Design a protein with these regions (language model features):
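Solvent-exposed segments in extracellular or luminal domains encompassing
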Residues: 83-99, 278-298
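Aromatic-rich carbohydrate-binding modules that target alpha-glucans
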Residues: 120-175, 185-200, 262-277
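C-terminal beta-strand-rich structural cap/linker in extracellular carbohydrate-active enzymes
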Residues: 216, 757-773
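An acidic-aromatic substrate-binding cleft motif
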Residues: 325-372, 379
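Substrate-binding/active-site clefts of carbohydrate-active enzymes
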Residues: 343, 355-358, 389-411, 416, ...
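Active-site-proximal helices and loops of the catalytic beta/alpha 8
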Residues: 511, 518-519, 523-605, 651-672, ...
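Aromatic/acidic polysaccharide-binding cleft in carbohydrate-active enzymes
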Residues: 606-664
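Carbohydrate-binding surface patches
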Residues: 695-746
Length: 773
């Protein structure tokens, strides 16, 4: 089936890629805009001109009158960049809020796609950087390039204006904290990094709960429940808002959508019309016509919901099937189609840089890594993440030259699969580094593309040659153009996902390696469209873990795409604490920021202090701070990640693993962190509180700025903050200082689980971490 996937949500100013799934490169595809809201008048006030500070304003951006593409001056349906006569992939660039309805004509028939567009979130802002901030003498600067997520890190596109002694960029971006690079002479080595804050509300978030209730109850909340003779499916949105939202979760509107793949337009509209506030009700007997096969082939009814205030949140989904579709005693079976694998409940992850793990003498191969699996097992980890293992001319492996073959210096595919089997024998899952945003320019596909072979003309994205910052002297295919690349990565040109041939190729790559490994870490996930990742998530086995590299972390990569995300908020805060630029209590700021961004599940974050792209924490901030930072990652919700060598005292990012001269005490410290986390379910639960017992912790001797404390409870206990009961809890105390801290703790806490169940008195000496019960 070439259906284009679930309903999509976006806002004015943010385009959406739409594409057929499972594409046939030889097929013909054509998109058509069937319905759209009336185009915005020139005098309409856009959101970024109003500057709302209240997160729950009254203006909802309704659908309004509809119009077609021919009646508007702005082209909202932009064809993909290919040389094909048809348009398999298009980009919806909405100019007004409301509902857009599209049709895809494909070889297997026509398919309907809806896109809900919310009002423009962007706000006019001015970014100013003193000329003296750039690490280059002012007289030597003849141009400056801005590099940030809002231009996809494409250099030489956005240029600030020189105004007096400042470089000034006028732009419009959504509310939030934005990291901006100002690059003198387009050179990343001469960049100045600036943080710019745009005021405004955070995003609401939701999860979906389902139940089945009897119909015909006059006391029920909705007409469907009162008027239906028979059981009624109830889908409730559990909504939350950031602490600074200025409104109650009950004030948040929720829009429900029935998946167009599962119901005809009339049935979908009837079902959606039953929604009231934050609840959707559906008579169970209306679900019976959904059964189209057995449990494996029947998709059921997919119901989506999105919260909206001044900004919209991430879409959540539930799949429901009536009893005649599946074997169950309940009238309806409801599942989360995007739930993480059962084995991936807060797993501890160990990243190995595959070309230095054997140490400073032996070359690292799959066989040598396999011989060291007992060591990895001794650390108590659940997942082994290997940096790229495919053919590449580089040590780091991110310049792929063959997606079908492993790197010859590492070993054969058979040797790789032997390593995977050895890990499985040790109950360790293996995550594969999936690098499909780009290839090496030495890949035969790019070489044929650059040489003008027609079959490869659309394989890579092209752009204006004036944007080149590498002085490469690219082969020109059309009007002084060049291949597109991010940053100054001229050796890894971007693949063109507008091409169905490329999509087919890379989906086959996904299929091939999904049959071998247990998960994918998606390199440069932010460079690839949401639509493609949604297809990957629906395509791979349910027990395959998906981890995204999105910098900074973005909740929209969680809506039916990835299970785990790089927690860049905590990473940045931990480094600020280590450098002395923030107090230890700033750990709470990182969690608050994730909520503000719109992340619903704190367990969906990968917590880390370093990786193969970043400096070693210990080298930058010292041993004691490094221990404390690691302890934070192991005592918060989510998945702690240890980068190989972190536990041995390595101070070079990709240098040889320290086997014979490593820090054994530090290794034991990490083993103990893993042991305590495994033994204490509350350390893996979702609930974190920085008030209550945590606020009672008093530093009597030591530096209070270097000490933080937080409670770990089950998430429902955290939510019930007004309860008089004292639920089971653990109190975590972390000390980032070089010297021990003496702290007073609540009387009812008696044992330190991190120190061999040592008894706790009125006060406690904390070297690095204490976990109190």
């Amino acid at each position: 089936m070439h259906e284009p996937g679930p309903p999509r949500v976006t806002s004015v100013g943010r385009s959406v890629e739409l594409a057929p799934r499972d594409p046939d490169p030889d097929g013909t595809y054509q998109w058509r805009l069937l319905d759209a809201p009336a185009a915005r008048r020139d005098d309409d006030a856009s959101r970024h001109e109003r500057g709302d500070e209240d997160g729950c304003d009254d203006e909802k951006g309704g659908v309004g009158a509809s119009t077609g593409q021919s009646e508007r001056t702005h082209t909202v349906l932009v064809p993909g960049e290919t040389t094909r006569a048809d348009d398999p992939v298009v980009h919806l660039d909405p100019d007004a809020p409301g509902l857009y309805v599209l049709e895809l004509a494909a070889p297997d028939g026509t398919h309907r796609q809806r896109v809900r567009v919310f009002p423009d979130e962007r706000r006019e802002t001015t970014i100013r950087v003193p000329t003296s901030a750039l690490p280059v003498p002012d007289d030597d600067v003849d141009r400056v390039s801005v590099m940030w997520r809002h231009n996809d890190r494409l250099l030489a596109r956005d240029r600030p204006e020189r105004v007096g002694d400042e470089w000034v960029l006028q732009t419009a971006v959504p509310p939030g904290r934005h990291d901006v690079g100002f690059l003198a002479n387009d050179d990343r080595a001469t960049s100045h990094h600036h943080t710019h804050e745009v005021p405004g509300p955070g995003r609401p978030r939701l999860s979906l709960d389902t139940s089945v209730v009897p119909g015909g109850d006059d006391r029920a909340e909705t007409p469907t429940e009162r008027d239906t003779n028979g059981p009624v499916l109830v889908v409730d949105a559990d909504v939350d808002v950031p602490p600074t939202a200025g409104c109650d979760p009950s004030d948040v509107d929720v829009e429900f959508f029935v998946d167009d793949r599962d119901a005809d337009p009339e049935s979908a509209a009837r079902t959606e019309a039953r929604a009231e506030a934050q609840r959707l009700t559906v008579p169970v007997d209306t679900l019976s016509d959904l059964c189209r096969g057995d449990e494996e082939t029947n998709a059921g009814l997919r119901i989506h919901a999105v919260p909206r205030t001044a900004r919209h949140g991430v879409m959540a989904t539930v799949t429901v099937r009536p009893t005649d579709c599946v074997d169950t005693d309940a009238p309806v079976r409801a599942t989360d189609p995007h739930a993480p694998p059962a084995w991936a409940d807060s797993p501890t992850i160990y990243e190995v840089y595959v070309r230095s793990f054997a140490g400073d003498t032996l070359p690292t191969t799959f066989a040598e890594i396999e011989r060291r699996v007992p060591y990895v097992e001794s650390l108590g980890v659940d997942v082994l993440w290997l940096t790229p293992v495919l053919a590449s001319p580089t040590d780091h492996g991110y310049h792929v030259t063959d997606y079908d073959e492993t790197a010859t210096d590492l070993g054969s595919r058979q040797a790789f699969e032997s390593l995977v089997d050895a890990c499985h024998d040790a109950e360790i899952r293996v995550v594969f580094d999936l690098v499909i945003n780009h290839t090496s320019r030495d890949h035969p596909a790019f070489q044929m593309h650059a040489a003008g072979v027609p079959a490869y003309r659309d394989h890579y994205r092209r752009t204006d040659g004036a944007f080149d910052v590498t002085d490469t002297g690219w082969a020109i295919l059309d009007s002084d153009d060049m291949p597109e690349y991010y940053f100054d990565w001229g050796r890894i040109p971007n693949l063109n996902f507008d091409s169905p041939t490329v999509r087919r190729w890379l989906l086959d790559v996904v299929d091939q390696w999904a049959a071998v490994v247990d998960g994918f870490r998606a390199d440069v996930a932010w460079g690839i469209s949401h639509g493609f990742w949604k297809e990957v998530a629906d395509r791979v086995p349910d027990d395959l873990l998906l981890l995204d590299e999105t910098l900074p972390h973005d909740p929209f990569y969680g809506g039916g795409e990835f299970h785990l995300h790089y927690d860049t908020s905590l990473y940045e805060v931990l480094h600020d604490i280590g450098a002395g630029d923030a107090p230890a209590d700033a750990v709470s700021d990182a969690l608050d920021r994730a909520e503000w961004l719109g992340f619903d599940d704190p367990g969906a974050q990968m917590r880390y202090v370093e990786n193969h792209d970043e400096p070693r924490y210990r080298a930058e901030h010292g041993d004691e701070a490094a221990r404390a930072a690691a302890a934070v990652t192991f005592t918060l919700p989510g998945s702690p990640m240890v980068y190989a060598g972190q536990e041995r005292g390595n101070e070079t990012t990709r240098g040889p693993f320290r086997w014979h001269d490593g820090d054994t005490a530090l290794t034991e410290f990490h083993r103990e962190l893993s042991r305590v986390r495994e033994a204490e379910p509350l350390l893996r639960a979702d609930g974190v509180r920085f008030d209550g017992a945590a606020a009672e912790v008093e530093v009597r001797h030591g530096d209070p700025e270097r000490v933080t404390a937080y409670e770990r409870r089950a998430s429902d206990a955290v939510a019930d903050s007004r309860s008089d009961s004292t639920p089971d809890r653990r109190l975590v105390v972390i000390n980032f200082a070089d010297e021990p801290a003496t702290v007073a703790v609540p009387d009812e806490l008696e044992r330190d689980l991190f120190a061999g169940e040592r008894r706790v008195g009125e006060s406690l000496v904390v070297d690095t971490v204490a976990v109190l019960a």
